[in-house]
UniProtKB/Swiss-Prot annotation:
Function: Pyrophosphatase that catalyzes the hydrolysis of nucleoside triphosphates to their monophosphate derivatives, with a high preference for the non-canonical purine nucleotides XTP (xanthosine triphosphate), dITP (deoxyinosine triphosphate) and ITP. Seems to function as a house-cleaning enzyme that removes non-canonical purine nucleotides from the nucleotide pool, thus preventing their incorporation into DNA/RNA and avoiding chromosomal lesions.
Designated name of the protein: dITP/XTP pyrophosphatase
Enzyme class: hydrolase
Record: active site: D76
Binding site for Mg(2+): D76
Lineage of source species: Bacteria, Bacillati, Actinomycetota, Actinomycetes, Mycobacteriales
E.C. number(s) listed in UniProt: 3.6.1.66
Entry-linked NCBIfam families: RdgB/HAM1 family non-canonical purine NTP pyrophosphatase (TIGR00042)
Family: Belongs to the HAM1 NTPase family.
């Protein structure tokens, strides 16, 4: 009987977890069983005190691995807007001062960009994914370039998706199907870079 390796996805964000599951499942990684934080004993929240996405992703994966002994993957992601000097960056989820309030965060972002012309509204979604296991640590980064729309459009996705228009498209990320988003998104790109390490884990 083939051994099954348990992989802990260290996130409490259900929408992010679903996206991670879709991408990993779509890669056809046999031999891996995905677990969420809800499947293990309660873990303390890892504070996002890093100055980079990589710092935060690695801290979350390290904490999960240390607490459970399970190979753990974690993501930290956000939006970098050129006209705002790369902000909100690692502060994306709490840009308005209220953690996880997507509507408030988006409203503040649009207000800050209200006088910025279209040609200067460039931005990129960034995702850093970290894998920590008994074999070591791997950290990768994916970016999804685009621009910021002037008003929200679409009901899909989460976070800043309704105002992010990927280069080469006229729809926002919130107007893409899950499959379309997974194929091109920052998280999808980061996970694609992580797949060799995950395959080694599954066959190890």
């Amino acid at each position: 009987m083939a051994l099954v390796t348990k992989l802990l996805v260290a996130s409490r964000n259900r929408k992010k977890l679903a996206e991670l599951r879709r991408v990993l499942d779509g890669a056809g990684l046999s031999g891996l069983t995905l677990l969420s934080l809800g499947d293990v004993s309660p873990l303390p929240e890892t504070p996002e005190t890093g100055v980079t996405f990589e710092d935060n992703a690695l801290a979350k994966a390290r904490d999960a691995f240390s607490a459970t002994g399970l190979a753990s993957v974690a993501d930290d992601s956000g939006l970098e807007v050129a006209a705002l000097g790369g902000m909100p960056g690692v502060l994306s989820a709490r840009w308005s001062g209220r953690y996880g309030d997507d509507a408030a965060n988006t409203a503040l972002l649009l207000a800050q960009l209200c006088d910025v012309p279209d040609e200067r509204r460039g931005a990129a979604f960034v995702s850093a994914c970290a894998l920590v296991s008994g074999s070591g640590e791997v950290v990768v980064r994916g970016e999804w370039p685009g621009t910021i729309a002037r008003e929200p459009r679409g009901d899909g996705g989460f976070g800043y998706d309704p105002v992010f228009v990927p280069y080469g498209d006229d729809r926002t990320a919130a107007q893409l199907s899950p499959a379309e988003k997974d194929a091109v998104s920052h998280r999808g790109r980061a996970l694609a870079l992580l797949l060799p390490a995950l395959r080694s884990l599954a066959t190890g």
